[in-house]
A protein has these predicted regions:
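Periplasmic-binding protein-like
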Residues: 15-18, 60, 64-120, 123-132
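Short, Asp-centered acidic motifs that coordinate Mg2+ and/or phosphate
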Residues: 54-55, 74
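Soluble non-cytosolic domains of exported or imported proteins
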Residues: 9-13, 39-42, 57, 90-98, ...
Length: 132
């Protein structure tokens, strides 16, 4: 879908790394008409809205949120990669770690997690899974 198109990606993101020289998707990037890097995802969308680029490559939750709030954009079905996210704590701050773990476990146990997963099926794979 993007062959010959102008594409924007945020500087310093995994999207940029994948598309850059030596990245896993370097060959895909070579099919683009041009690849612009922007300092922020908002700048990417500004360039898209202004017609400077034909598409932007951003994380799916960012794209989904932006499209919901701004008419005239759509998300393509292709996914370029998958990432996992975690929560980091200062070394030795076990109390904070335990507090966050307990809060997340609570939403799993009380069914809130299942409701979130049902309401937002596109992001369910990005949510934290815990054992009961």
């Amino acid at each position: 879908d993007l062959a010959g198109k102008s594409v924007a990606v945020q500087l310093g993101t995994s999207g940029e790394s994948l598309l850059s020289e030596g990245g896993d998707l370097e060959s895909l990037a070579k099919t683009f008409g041009s690849l612009m890097t922007c300092d922020s995802f908002l700048k990417c969308f500004t360039e898209l809205g202004g017609g400077a680029v034909d598409a932007v490559i951003v994380d799916k939750p960012v794209a989904t949120s932006y499209v919901q709030q701004n008419a005239g954009f759509t998300i393509l079905d292709e996914e370029l990669g998958a990432e996992q996210y975690g929560i980091a704590f200062r070394s030795g701050d076990q109390e904070l770690c335990d507090t966050v773990q307990a809060a997340v476990q609570k939403i799993v146990d009380n069914g809130t997690y299942a409701k979130i997963a049902e309401k937002y099926p596109d992001i369910v794979n990005n949510l934290l899974f815990l054992s009961k």
